[in-house]
Amino acid sequence: MSFGILFEDEKYDGNDIRRVGEEFLYIELAGHHVESFEACDFEKIVCTDPHSYNTFKNEYPEVDFEEFADDPIMPFEYDEKWNKDGEVDVLHWTQAVEELVNDGKLELSGTELEYTVTYHDPCHLGRYNDEYEAPRELIRATGCDLEEMPRNRSNSFCCGGGGGGLWMDFDEEPKPSEERLREALEDTDAGPNIEKFVVACPMCMTMYEDGRKTGDFEDDIEIVDIAELIVEAIGKEERANLEVAA
């Protein structure tokens, strides 16, 4: 897979800025990014954050850049609808890596790891974009035993970080992140045998790491990103191949 990054031209996508009411700053960021995209030669955008994925895929194409292109405050001149026909394929990284797994590019046997895990569906990947299978396929590809929480897929329970929640103090008890971790350890079929709470969103990672501490779950469960499982599984597969070769 050939890829590039925007380096200094990569700024914040603007999702949370927009959610807390800074619409014009959001448009400024959107205009900057689409001009940067137009200067590059590529076929797909791969996002590591479901919020960026949703913003690039669904919200940038809705922006009327022509309305703001001549505004002296706005630092862009782009005056067309961006990606209105979906000519640029926007992917979450789990979708891109799922393609590699299905094509055999990562050479995973599906037996590398033996953890019992549960998976949390991020709002912007799941409910907003109906992507439920790619993360689960990657977890299974590592060999992990995936146990579902009662609230999963379209009924998933938010981590509490969206809409500016990441920067707010929650007065209620338990916090959303604490309640979700309790659900993982008490309401899944595996119960306390759940070893890892798997996420696919950096905001969820932050919220659940905090909830793990404030909810006193530090000795009970580990928060990991799917990417960490894949890296560990690839490492085990490579070591196994070296042992066979020796």
Q: How would you name each of these model-derived features?
A:
Residues 1-246:
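Iron-sulfur cluster-binding electron-transfer modules in prokaryotic oxidoreductases
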